[in-house]
Amino acid sequence: MKDFLKFTFASVIGVILAGVVFTILGIITLVGIVASSDTETVVKDNSIFVLDFKGSLSERVQENPLQQLLGEEFEAYGLDDILASIKKAKDNDKIKGIYIQPSYLEASYASLEEIRNALLDFKESGKFIVAYADQYAQGMYYLSSVADKIIINPQGSIGWHGAGMQPVFFKNLVSKLGLEVQVFRVGTYKSAVEPFIATEMSPANREQMTECLESVWHRILADVSDSRRIPTDTLNAYADRYMDFCQAEEYIQCKLADTLMYKDEVISYLKQLSGRDENDKLNSLFIEDMINVKKDVPKDKSGNIIAVYYAYGEILDAPGSSTEDCIDVQKMCKDLRKLRDNDDVKAVVLRVNSPGGSAYGSDQIWREVVRLKEKKPVIVSMGDYAASGGYYISCAANRIFADPTTLTGSIGIFGMMYSGEKLFTETLGLNFDVVKTNKMADLGASLGPVLTRPLNASEQELMQNYVNRGYKLFVNRCAEGRKMSTEAIEKVAEGRVWTGAMAKDLGLVDELGGIDKALNAAATQAGIENYSIIGYPEKENIFASLLGNQKKHYINSEIKEYLGSYYNSFKALENIKDANCIQARMPFDPNIQ
């Protein structure tokens, strides 16, 4: 018995000591992560900035210490960090050029165009840009086409096949589950409900998707033609041939690439360009290094601030606990009120990258934008898309900027309700009864997001009238903000999606250009020359992140890596449970291949 107690006591002490040791090691590791994230990067002479793309692109990214602690390699980049890093590389004399290494990046063409334009600006410094890949995906080739020299592996390939979209339809799946979908909408082109009630695109939806694709493809052709000096007709003919499976030598003959090299030869070439000896190592700086490089410009002392408020993701009245990358209506309204009352903030650039969401929430944000504009200029910069609710929250701004390939418009709303009467009674064996004092007292009775019975004719009429009123309000908001007649807005509304280039011609957008142009316009309208730029909402520090929703961030990043281009479709379905029934949402997933 005595020996047993000794053994038990020793085991308990061992477990406690092991726990203490692991806790100490965890704290040391965390402190190391924090220290490394805050340490200023020292740039060596003859350095090269390496744009090594692999992963996904967002407007902004939050540091994920849990992912770092677990040693995960999945990368997520913030567009804001990339654009700032390219600017720093241009201004830093020790950085001789940029090496684009485009493995894979899940990004829209609007974001790629912003990066591409930043690289064009970088080239004005006279520094070199070299691109090399084993296989160039089409989007990555579009980005890389700005390079002075495009190098491809002798066994490599270039994706060049045109633009396409492939929506997914769930009607048969919904039917097999025993669900009935009831739809209420305004607008011939408001086709967000189609995946649940059809098995193919309607003629109107096919029309708008085709025209948007052609507009985006036209921009891609024009940009690549300008950089590679290949006629657009020739580039289009190449796409018809589906160039992805050509021999590498053919890309040289077609002038899509400049030369063939293996990776070791590319490294030697980069050493020559940057002034390094063959036996030296490249002085390489990656995005995570450039974030901590000090800006090579004098610090502004004016006290003037231009706030850049990032509004990206679905517009949700009450985001669920597992929801991230969304616009929390209550939080954004509160933040805009704070910016309104901050006298140091002279102007606000509202960076919108949203397919829309709650119609009610969109109107609440619209109201705060109007109030903000009463005190200081508000300039909208549209990202990948600012459609439906995303356009709703933008339309009141002083000026609107969009990239040519931005997807915007979609002025319209819809409602969608799910009835599970067949699922509940025939499949699950559930029955429902009701007592009520008034005719429609049980309207909306449900289990979770699914109604226990479908709406009858009078209830459907009630819902449709509600949607009609919401659409009329949306049109009036746009007419007021854009200083156009309601008749003019109605001609370009009907839920139709437009590219930025098309929207400018229609008066829905003021100018084409990225966030830099929007910042310049904000400074001009505010009448200031010297200012600092501060991003909002403020990012969490690493300790707050670790104590907050890191499990959620980690799980979402893993799902994003696994699903790839289907992640947006997954998020749209997931957010159905968080959304109210009346939506101002883009009619399709803007995933252009």
Regions found by a protein language model. Give the residues of each.
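Charged, glycine-interspersed solvent-exposed loop segments at helix/strand-loop junctions
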Residues: 171-270, 421-506, 510, 516-521, ...
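Active-site proximal loops enriched in glycine and acidic residues that flank catalytic Cys/His/Asp
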Residues: 310-313, 352-354, 382-384, 404-406, ...
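Short glycine/threonine-rich loop-to-helix capping motif typified by GTGT followed
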Residues: 359-364, 502-505, 547-549
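N-terminal type II signal-anchor transmembrane helix
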Residues: 2-42, 46
